[in-house]
Amino acid sequence: MTEKPSVVATLFRFQSVFGLLAVFVAAIIFSPRKNGAILFVSADNLANVVRAVSEIGIIAVGMTFVILIGGIDLSVGAVLGLAAVGSAVLMVENDWGFLPSVLLVLVTGTIFGALQGVATAMIGIQSFIVTLAGLQIARGLARIWSGGQGVAISYGDGPKEAPTSFALLGERTFGGLVPIPVLIFAVVAIAAVVFLRVSAFSRHLYAVGGNEKAARLSGVPVVRVKIAVFAICGLLASLAGIVHAVQLNQGSPNDGIGYELDAIAAVVIGGTSLAGGRGSVAGTVAGALLLGVLNNILALNNIDSNIQLLIKGLVIVAAAALQRLRPAS
């Protein structure tokens, strides 16, 4: 007979969802008013929230895969910047088309991630060190590619203009309601959730994160799993870079600074264990939304940026502390 999970275990399992609901309610309560209307729940503001979440959310999905195997990827913010620069330079300065530019940027990010996976899985260097070096390398490549300057993106059919089809990624909405960047994030998240539920690879991934030695002895291709996971993370960081470029109409080698920390925070708040072997993409999505709502309500109330950092830090520490208290499953 299967034992039913306790109330405490259920609360911990859905900690990110309950946390998101709590922050959402608090945001409504403490939101500034204008002519009696709650600014936080206005359509424009909620659209801004989900737009802001889309980039971090896409990166955080990839980060979830890496953390599930007990690794970390500190290079994702720099890879985002490299992808944003690449998109801008290829389309504006090199007059490449939309599809070739996007494909090259995505392939570049995937290869970059895979090489980091090779260094971790085959050479045996800790992922923290590998991706810290990767962060510097990606930033350097972005500066070389852009000449150290940001590249503005203007749209049209003439020289030095990006195709108008690229602009549509940022300007259009799905069904008149959902911004395209948010739709991209939703598709990525849903695909990742389904993938982790039904694929044999997901079982290998959790096995490596739970006990790498035991996984190797049981025939799990640990090296291939690690390389694939870092490749996925690089791919999604590049995708986020494309979304970033189209939303800001520019690519800069400084884009994405600090994004790796926000992505890790979303994963931790979502309940994924930094030790590996336990967690979910659904939790990460809730964690990213929680951070987005928190950032937005603090900005609406004109809270000092230093205080905002303090509050976000306390939220992350609280989420990590809850993981320590979580009953063993």
What kind of feature is each model-predicted range?
Residues 231, 237, 247-313:
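Transmembrane alpha-helical segments in multi-pass inner-membrane proteins
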Residues 128-198, 225-228, 249-253:
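Transmembrane helix-bundle core of multi-pass membrane transporters
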Residues 9-54, 203, 242, 246-254:
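Helix-loop-helix hairpins and the membrane-proximal interhelical loops
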Residues 97, 101-105, 111-116, 175-251:
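Helix-loop-helix "hairpin" substructures at the membrane interface of multi-pass membrane proteins
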